């Protein structure tokens, strides 16, 4: 995997995400929670085995006392100019919300990987839905979905490239257990692929924004409403441009690796009268069904949603058959 040659490997979704995250970051602040635990465990194991990232450095992996602590360390690492990541789900993601607002507000480039899981209400459930991801829609993070193990590996790298350029943090998510623990045969990205996708000038720009006593500036102040309002508005152009930035990263990935993705992908009859809109693992099943029905002459189709936030309604409508 560490060579320049692409290989076919058998792994699950968690390992696929952790593989790219460990290779393209320098710090991982973790606290395991089902079903995301293996991502942190893989990262911890690879660091203990002295596996380098794509720059030849050994990433620092630190387990904190809770997800709240993990997100605080994660935020701090980003402020120090490190390329940092974390992995979580469900209640763990909820504990990260305060720092997620800070990370997005400061326009930090980063990718967090989430194996989406039900939130505890009248009872706890470790199984999968998107309740946790839906709870963080207002934090200012981009939300990017993967539907299969191959997509997890691909989207993890696409997200890393896009966030460095767009400066909007990305929450990359996939269905807990159904995809996080699905074992599949995939084409593993090589370190050369990752180096081709990551722009070192953008990495340097991220480092240059770090808090540094040799280049002091103020951040994290208390502001009155007039100033606060203007600062909030000044972030919007980054958010509005992020969808195009993600598509640009997808296009670059297609040139480097060969697999093509779009923010919304349509499969099915060009004259479909009935269309399913799906995000996550269900899209895989729906696609097989659609292809089977279309072969029998049915006018049906499927729109697969990849970038859920920012949601580009115009591109969604363009993806639908005319």
Residue ranges and their predicted role:
Residues 44-47, 101-104, 160-162, 187-190, ...:
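Short, solvent-exposed amphipathic alpha-helical segments in soluble enzyme
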Residues 126-176, 200-201:
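Conserved thiamine diphosphate
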Residues 55, 170-265:
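Conformationally flexible catalytic loops at phosphate/diphosphate-handling active centers
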Residues 117-118, 174-181, 280-282:
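Glycine-rich beta-alpha junction loops
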Residues 96, 122, 181-183, 285-287:
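Short helix/loop capping segments that flank catalytic or ligand/cofactor-binding pockets
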Residues 1-135, 140, 157, 177, 251-322:
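Thiamine diphosphate
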């Amino acid at each position: 995997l560490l060579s320049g040659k692409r290989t076919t490997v058998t792994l699950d979704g968690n390992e696929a995400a952790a593989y790219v995250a460990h290779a393209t970051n320098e710090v991982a602040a973790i606290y395991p929670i089902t079903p995301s635990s293996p991502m942190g465990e893989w990262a911890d194991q690879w660091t203990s085995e002295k596996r380098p990232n794509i720059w030849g450095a050994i990433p620092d992996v630190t387990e904190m006392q809770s997800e709240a602590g993990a997100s605080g360390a994660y935020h701090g690492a980003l402020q120090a100019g490190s390329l940092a990541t974390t992995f979580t789900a469900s209640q763990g993601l909820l504990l990260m919300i305060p720092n997620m607002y800070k990370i997005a507000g400061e326009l930090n480039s980063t990718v967090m990987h989430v194996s989406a899981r039900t939130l505890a209400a009248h009872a706890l459930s470790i199984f999968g839905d998107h309740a946790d991801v839906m709870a963080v829609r207002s934090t200012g993070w981009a939300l990017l979905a993967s539907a299969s193990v191959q997509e997890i590996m691909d989207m993890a790298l696409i997200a890393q490239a896009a966030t460095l350029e767009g400066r909007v943090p990305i929450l990359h998510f996939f269905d807990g257990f159904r995809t996080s623990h699905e074992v599949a045969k995939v084409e593993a990205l090589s370190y050369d692929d990752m180096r081709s996708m990551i722009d070192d000038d953008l990495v340097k720009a991220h480092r240059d924004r770090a808090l540094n006593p040799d280049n002091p500036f103020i951040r994290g102040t208390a502001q009155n409403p007039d100033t606060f309002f203007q600062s909030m508005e000044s972030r919007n152009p980054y958010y509005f441009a992020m969808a195009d930035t993600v598509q640009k990263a997808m296009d670059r990935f297609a040139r480097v690796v060969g697999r093509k993705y779009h923010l919304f992908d349509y499969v099915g009859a060009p004259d479909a009268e009935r269309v399913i809109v799906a995000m996550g693992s269900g899209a895989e099943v729906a696609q097989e069904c659609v292809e089977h029905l279309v072969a029998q002459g049915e006018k049906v189709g499927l729109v697969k949603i990849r970038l859920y936030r920012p949601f580009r309604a115009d591109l969604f409508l363009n993806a639908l058959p005319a």
